[in-house]
C-alpha cells in the first residue's frame, strides 16, 4: 500500500480538542477506505510566514498514512470543504520515518534550552546588555553628512 506524509494547518481559534476531533474524523475516513494512520504528531500553534485566510497562526498536525490513493483523495476532499483547515499537503514517500519528525526534535531541543544555565548567575552580556565589541575598534570622529544638496 502506498505511504504518505500529510500535514494540515487548522485555524488558530480552533481549540486543541477540536483539532483532535478533526484528526479522528480524518482517521475514520482513511480507515473506511482501507488504510491506516501509522503516526500522528501535533506540532502545536505556530506563527505563519504570511497570512492565510486572514490568520497569522495555525495548529500544525502531521499524519503518516498507509492507504490506497482513493482514501487519501477522499480525506483531501473533506479537508477542502472544511472551513477550519487552512492548508494541507500530502507527499507520497518510499518509507515512513519511525523516529520523531524534525519539528518534534526541534521542540525537544528548545525545551532543554532553559535548564542549561541551572542556578548559575546571568552573564553580563545576556539580552544585549552590553559587552565587548571584540576586535572592532572605536568609530572615531566622523565628518558631518549633508543630505539636502546644500554645499
Curated annotation (Swiss-Prot):
GO terms for cellular component: cytosolic small ribosomal subunit. GO terms for molecular function: small ribosomal subunit rRNA binding; structural constituent of ribosome. InterPro entries: Ribosomal_bS6, Ribosomal_bS6_sf, Ribosomal_S6_plastid/chlpt, Transl_elong_EF1B/ribsomal_bS6. CDD domains: bS6. GO terms for biological process: translation. Pfam families: Ribosomal_S6. It comes from the Bacteria. Residues 105-151 have a biased composition (Basic and acidic residues). SUPFAM superfamilies: Ribosomal protein S6. Keywords: Ribonucleoprotein, Ribosomal protein, RNA-binding, rRNA-binding. Residues 97-151 are annotated as: Disordered. Gene3D superfamilies: 3.30.70.60. Binds together with bS18 to 16S ribosomal RNA. HAMAP family: Ribosomal_bS6 (MF_00360). Belongs to the bacterial ribosomal protein bS6 family. NCBIfam families: S6 (TIGR00166). This is Small ribosomal subunit protein bS6.
